[in-house]
């Protein structure tokens, strides 16, 4: 599971997830990418499930880049606990995803294999995604 090795502050407030992604919105490393269309908090388990789906489909060929990292702590209180008595303990970590963010990148495989692998990864994720190629985004910029 992905999580920070050490953090300056253990607990964070929730914050707002508004607007489009202005950083991490281009295919920077690979040839193909998986772009988020919706906003969400993505857990490290969801990221790992998508990564396994990609690596299982491309077998030995290709290189995978994970462009997101779960660095936001989410706290939870035990079940049937009364309100008050402080903020709960850190339960898990999430990555804050905005629309337009590239989640995964892939290189070194045929286009049809890359497309199928990224489609399988998208099915594991809680949001709608689209598959983009490096040349598609370069033409738009």
Curated annotation (Swiss-Prot):
Keywords: Ribonucleoprotein, Ribosomal protein, RNA-binding, rRNA-binding, tRNA-binding. One of its GO terms (molecular function) is structural constituent of ribosome. One of its GO terms (biological process) is translation. Residues 1-21 are annotated as: Disordered. One of its GO terms (cellular component) is cytosolic large ribosomal subunit. The keyword tRNA-binding applies. InterPro entries: Ribosomal_uL16 (IPR047873), Ribosomal_uL16_bact-type (IPR000114), Ribosomal_uL16_CS (IPR020798), Ribosomal_uL16_dom (IPR016180), Ribosomal_uL16_sf (IPR036920). It comes from the Bacteria. Binds 23S rRNA and is also seen to make contacts with the A and possibly P site tRNAs. NCBIfam families: rplP_bact. Part of the 50S ribosomal subunit. Belongs to the universal ribosomal protein uL16 family. This is Large ribosomal subunit protein uL16. It comes from Roseiflexus castenholzii (strain DSM 13941 / HLO8).
């Amino acid at each position: 599971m992905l999580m920070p090795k050490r953090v300056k502050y253990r607990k964070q407030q929730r914050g707002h997830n508004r607007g489009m992604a202005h950083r991490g919105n281009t295919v920077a490393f690979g040839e193909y990418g998986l772009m988020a269309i919706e906003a969400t908090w993505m857990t490290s388990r969801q990221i790992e499930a998508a990564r396994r789906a990609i690596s299982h489909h491309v077998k030995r060929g290709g290189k995978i880049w994970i462009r997101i990292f779960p660095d936001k702590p989410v706290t939870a209180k035990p079940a049937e606990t009364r309100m008050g008595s402080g903020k709960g303990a850190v339960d898990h970590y999430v990555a804050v995803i905005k629309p337009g963010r590239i989640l995964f990148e892939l290189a070194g495989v045929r286009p049809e294999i890359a497309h199928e692998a990224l489609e399988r990864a998208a099915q594991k994720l809680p949001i709608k995604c689209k598959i983009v190629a490096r040349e598609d985004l370069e033409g738009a910029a």
